[in-house]
């Protein structure tokens, strides 16, 4: 993951998207091999986030306000010559532990975590389901236009929706997977999933339960308070 800090805003996105974007710029046709769920843009030191997600090969954007109330503790430690200080918060249905450094005066961090008096180097939930750790800090001499992997992605412009609409999209994707193929003429499309090449509606029906089971088994949203019930 990349935390991309600019003068007025920050972006958080998958590093893999940079490579995919470069391929698209060279004329390649690319599709996602993974769900887009943690792509975020916000103004510096703001709790107002723009969330970018993909569902059924479409790209969406919805706003959210994600205020965090941090408790800064006296405990400190050192990491790569940086002095880190501990902080805690309960947010999104989870308890989080963070380590930030006053030596790097940016009140930002991974995903939606921010508003501590220094850059967040580490943050994880109490059950260790999610664990973000800063690997390196790089100053980019030639500015990369990361809007191509956030505000648009693989040539797709986002459709503006609400959180509620996003939740409905997730439920619909579970109840009616691959619905976009049902109206397409047989022989004009193909889909490879679960090591099977599907070319007709009957094939889609045969993998529906496996697809739904995969969704349930892999569903572990960062923000439990916004989770949908399958």
List each language-model region with its residue ranges:
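Extracellular or lumenal secretory-pathway regions
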Residues: 1-76, 83, 96-97, 128-230
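Glycine- and acidic-residue-rich phosphate-binding/metal-coordinating active-site segment common to enzymes
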Residues: 76-79, 83-138
């Amino acid at each position: 993951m990349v935390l991309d800090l600019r003068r007025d805003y920050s972006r958080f996105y998958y590093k893999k998207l940079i490579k995919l974007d470069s391929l698209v710029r060279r004329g390649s046709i690319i599709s996602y091999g993974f769900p887009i769920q943690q792509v975020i843009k916000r103004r510096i030191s703001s709790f107002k986030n723009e969330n970018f997600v993909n569902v059924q090969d479409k790209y969406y954007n919805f706003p959210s306000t994600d205020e965090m109330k941090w408790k800064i503790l006296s405990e400190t430690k050192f990491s790569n010559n940086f002095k880190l200080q501990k902080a805690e918060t309960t947010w999104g249905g989870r308890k989080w532990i963070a380590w930030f450094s006053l030596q790097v005066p940016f009140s930002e961090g991974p995903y939606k975590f921010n508003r501590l008096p220094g850059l967040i180097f580490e943050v994880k939930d109490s059950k260790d389901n999610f664990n973000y750790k800063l690997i390196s800090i790089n100053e980019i001499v030639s500015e990369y236009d990361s809007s191509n992997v956030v505000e648009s992605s693989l040539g797709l412009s986002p459709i503006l929706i609400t959180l509620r609409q996003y939740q409905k999209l997730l439920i619909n994707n579970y109840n009616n997977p691959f619905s976009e193929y049902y109206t397409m003429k047989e022989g004009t499309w193909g889909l490879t999933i679960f090591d099977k090449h599907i070319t007709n509606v009957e094939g889609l029906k045969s993998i529906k339960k496996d697809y739904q089971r995969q969704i349930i088994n892999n569903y572990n949203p960062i923000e439990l308070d916004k989770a949908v019930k399958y």
